[in-house]
């Protein structure tokens, strides 16, 4: 009971509140760019014909959007920007379950607010949701989302491991920027590879906000189950098979439990 009370108390400490806000704002930024680029592409091709240039534009927008989102939050919250990433770090013991729940809430709120703002400033344009292509089954789409998320989350783990260079405070802003760029790049590549099949969400928050604002919740299970399973496998593969030794955490203030995993410093409270 004492441990539970202590954990809950740390969940509302000033460093924790800053971490939650960082997750809210960074997720807001990423989803605003990701969904906004999709709206722009749709306005340029209103007949909804297949357009490779539109796919390229949204992939580039998401790559640079995630790059910026991870970079600005890396030293405060770890720059998760994705409930699947948070889930992976919780499995690895780098963030407590109560903290993960608050991270998820912040990410969901950030995504929803981004879509609300887009809806109202775009003259009432419908907010596009991630959808499964007619050629895909729900099961197949879930597997694909899991594979894509595995690649992204595994990249996050490798790019963030200090034994391979690390980033997020330990190695300086240049290393943070490089790691964030790598994560953004693999995300953009995955959008190019599977954007026409499932929308290449790889991020439950990316699908949740548009669903709430649009009111269309079809196939939400695909965009939650697939990424969560893929993230869990990525965490286990990296931590148990590839790099089984957990890095020592960097010194942190006595009021915090600093859980670093490479590039990502997660303030666990």
UniProtKB/Swiss-Prot annotation:
The keyword Transmembrane helix applies. It is found in: Vacuole membrane. It comes from the Eukaryota. One of its GO terms (cellular component) is membrane. It is a multi-pass membrane protein. The chain crosses the membrane at residues 19-39, 54-74, 84-104, 139-159, 177-197, 223-243. Keywords: Membrane, Repeat, Transmembrane, Transmembrane helix, Transport, Vacuole. Aquaporins facilitate the transport of water and small neutral solutes across cell membranes. May be involved in transport from the vacuolar compartment to the cytoplasm. This is Probable aquaporin TIP5-1. The gene is TIP5;1.
